[in-house]
């Protein structure tokens, strides 16, 4: 297939594709062609591609424009929305009932869309995920985070979502046991009902999102790799960690799990048991390691009172 050659691509039904493959793109000029190629080569299922460029300063949008099929879309944000809001923009404009995010420096392996989408033939399934292959020069990071799903106990093809949530919360809800968005497919309406990606969580935004989806649905697991995640030091997570914008991430996740009306009592109790220890641990960590100790300690001090009121205001409205 030659990029830009309209005769070499197949158009997509723009009205109602089964899957919306969403690429929240930002300065991915070096990798976007490989990313899009991995999507365009998917077979056996109808899908649209929606690229939402977040005001990039490189040539990634121009590259993407030459590769998209008739019916695919390239949208550009001006000004930049930021990572979390750009993911929500993708959810907003998607037409498919199923959502597959693919980050601009990641790629899908052959058969990924067909394999994951089949799990949604069961209407109770709202989310499906698979292991991802990690490419990184950081051997220690790869060893620690390369096979995150193995932290689950008795992970099956089909799982009760709240039971998976409980396992994660019993261990503190501080690590991503699912993977990045490229490793996951989910129902668009479920994501909207759960409130989308929160914009007040920074490092653990994926963890928060997966937990809220799993509280609301059955979850399928495919036991073989279906995507490739490229990990580099120059990631948004690395930048967040350097500035400690994430000081309240874990408290906000635990608070949400306590107040969410769909949380079973077991999840609420586990989250409540972790709340004070996690809060005190972050206070000590900030006080010892910094940076911006005064600013972050000022944000942490009123958290036991402020965060519960904040979470209740953010809950999705009941029908």
Swiss-Prot record:
Gene3D superfamilies reported for this sequence: Spore Coat Polysaccharide Biosynthesis Protein SpsA, Chain A
Cellular localization per UniProt: Membrane
Entry GO terms, CC: membrane
Pfam families according to UniProt: Glycos_transf_2
Topological category with respect to the lipid bilayer: Single-pass membrane protein
Keyword Zinc attached: no
Keyword vocabulary terms for this entry: Membrane, Transmembrane, Transmembrane helix
Superkingdom, taxonomy of origin: Bacteria
Transmembrane stretches, start-end: 270-290
The protein, known as: Uncharacterized protein MT1568
Organism: Mycobacterium tuberculosis (strain CDC 1551 / Oshkosh)
């Amino acid at each position: 297939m030659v990029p830009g050659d309209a005769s070499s691509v197949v158009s997509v039904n723009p009205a109602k594709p089964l899957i919306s493959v969403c690429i929240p793109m930002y300065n991915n000029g070096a990798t976007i062609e490989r990313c899009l190629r991995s999507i365009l080569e998917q077979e056996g299922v109808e899908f649209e591609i929606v690229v939402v460029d977040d005001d990039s300063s490189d040539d990634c949008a121009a590259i993407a424009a030459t590769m998209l099929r008739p019916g695919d879309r390239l949208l550009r944000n001006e000004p930049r929305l930021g990572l979390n809001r750009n993911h929500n923009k993708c959810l907003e404009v998607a037409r498919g009932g199923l959502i597959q995010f693919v980050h601009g420096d990641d790629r899908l392996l052959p058969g990924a869309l067909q394999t994951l989408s089949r799990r949604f033939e069961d209407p109770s399934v709202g989310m499906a995920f698979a292991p991802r292959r990690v490419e990184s020069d950081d051997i220690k990071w790869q060893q620690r985070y390369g096979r995150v799903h193995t932290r689950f106990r008795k992970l099956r093809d089909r799982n009760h979502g709240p039971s998976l949530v409980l396992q994660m919360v019993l261990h503190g809800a501080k690590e991503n046991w699912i993977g990045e968005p490229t490793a996951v497919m989910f129902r668009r309406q479920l994501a909207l009902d759960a409130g989308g990606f929160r914009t007040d969580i920074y490092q653990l935004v994926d963890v928060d999102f997966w937990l809220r989806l799993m509280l609301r649905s059955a979850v399928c697991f495919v036991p073989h790799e279906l995507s490739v995640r490229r990990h580099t030091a120059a990631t948004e997570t690395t930048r967040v960690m350097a500035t400690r914008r994430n000081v309240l991430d874990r408290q906000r996740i635990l608070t949400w799990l306590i107040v969410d009306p769909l949380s079973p009592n077991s999840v609420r109790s586990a989250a409540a048991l972790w709340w004070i220890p996690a809060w005190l641990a972050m206070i000590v960590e900030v006080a010892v390691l910094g940076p911006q100790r005064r600013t972050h300690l000022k944000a942490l001090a009123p958290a036991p009172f402020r965060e519960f009121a904040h979470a209740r205001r953010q809950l999705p409205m009941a029908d």
